[in-house]
């Protein structure tokens, strides 16, 4: 992160797709940015559950995965790879991170899925498994922000494990204390308005 100050890094924030974003991969997407620096950005889409059960691909982690217990499509890149994102209760204030968990922002962190699940079982509050991720090259995300493709908002630990991922886009917008709250009422198909 040599060229970026902590203030300008968007790591840990949410990218919320604007209604104008035309890419079907990101229609009404809520992306948690796991890394953002001068080399590019990486995140996972929090609101794209798949019909695949976690137990079908990562049996040992199934008991730790929160409801609905399915794999989420994290984005269009590397769909054959899995990422684990978990919230540690009290994680923002906990000094020592549990072995196998690396803090991204506050109580949210990445889980080493190669580690034995029992190593983290007592420490994890909620876990989501993502197939693939969303990635941007150097400056690409910044260009999309200038073009108005994304709203940038603060994340909350509960966003990772929302029990209603299909409502997350509206819920995140609705909690904003500015004009973004009104965007939550935007119709799914504006031509029917």
From Swiss-Prot:
Q: Which domain of life is it from?
A: Bacteria
Pfam families, sorted: DUF179
Report the GO terms under cellular component.
cytosol
- NCBIfam families assigned: PRK00228.2-2
Provide the family line: Belongs to the UPF0301 (AlgH) family.
- HAMAP family found in the cross-reference section: UPF0301
Please report the name of this protein according to its UniProt entry: UPF0301 protein SAV_5129
